[in-house]
């Protein structure tokens, strides 16, 4: 998440400085990636599009934009170390991402700063966004059944709170619904069907729950926004613990 944000900030900053920002620019990220991307996109007047986990969905957006000509892809990423700083491919490109990060490092070095200094600058500019993952491993046939039971129970009963945070809305990507818990309004997510639940929480926090596609695990992605780095890290660890406790 942090390396992707450093690259995104650099790309958008350079395009603005050199007047090379395309019309209708778009950043694309997976739903489990950092919410700092929303703040960066807003600062540069760039649209942010969210897709399901898996870089193929970012590739689909690129193809869609190329065919329609209505939008221009600028940068795409997912939290699991996947980035693509161009439209020449349809999958994540690690060598290109590393080269971009080296360019970002050189940019900050020219100012007497490190990459970490640059990240601190971004935290101070956009807020202290922190993200993490908690997992439960449930092996074998029984484990697979247990994982599905956890997802079924979660769909049947929505908590009012997760830790210190109120649950504001729930997105069920399997049912293609987003329910606002205050108004009761239900709208479509607009994304393909997937066995994923996403909880929008108070104070810019969130939690996303999904079974792993490659391991006998259920994954709990969480994100928070704090006023300080230490404060955000503490909030994150507390939320991870409360989420595991709730879904056990």
Regions picked out by a protein language model, each given a short descriptive name:
Residues 223:
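Active-site beta-strand/loop architecture of penicillin-binding DD-peptidases
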Residues 1-2, 13:
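Hydrophobic, small-residue-rich alpha-helical packing segments that form membrane-like cores
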Residues 6, 14, 18-210, 219, ...:
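Phosphate-binding and adjacent anionic-ligand microenvironments
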Residues 213-215:
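A generic beta-sheet turn/junction motif
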Residues 10:
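Active-site activation/catalytic loop segments of kinase-like enzymes and analogous catalytic loops
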């Amino acid at each position: 998440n942090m390396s992707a944000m450093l690259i995104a900030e650099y790309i958008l900053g350079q395009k603005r400085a050199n007047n090379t920002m395309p019309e209708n620019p778009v950043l694309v990220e997976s739903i489990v990636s950092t919410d700092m991307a929303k703040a960066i996109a807003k600062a540069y007047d760039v649209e942010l599009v969210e897709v399901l986990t898996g870089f193929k969905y970012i590739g689909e957006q690129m193809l869609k934009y190329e065919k329609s000509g209505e939008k221009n892809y600028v940068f795409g990423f997912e939290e699991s170390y996947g980035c693509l700083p161009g439209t020449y491919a349809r999958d994540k490109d690690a060598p290109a991402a590393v080269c971009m990060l080296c360019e970002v490092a050189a940019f900050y070095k020219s100012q007497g700063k490190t990459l970490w200094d640059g990240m601190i600058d971004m935290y101070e500019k956009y807020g202290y966004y922190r993200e993490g993952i908690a997992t439960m491993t449930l092996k074998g046939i029984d484990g697979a059944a247990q994982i599905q039971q956890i997802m079924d129970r979660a769909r049947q009963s929505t908590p009012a709170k997760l830790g210190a945070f109120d649950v504001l809305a729930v997105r069920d990507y399997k049912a293609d619904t987003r329910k606002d818990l205050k108004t009761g309004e239900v709208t479509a997510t607009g994304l393909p069907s997937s066995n994923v639940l996403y909880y929008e929480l108070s104070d810019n926090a969130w939690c996303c729950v999904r079974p792993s596609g490659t391991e006998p695990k259920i994954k709990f992605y969480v994100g928070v926004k704090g006023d300080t780095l230490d404060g955000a890290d503490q909030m994150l660890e507390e939320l991870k613990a409360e989420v595991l406790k709730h879904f056990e």
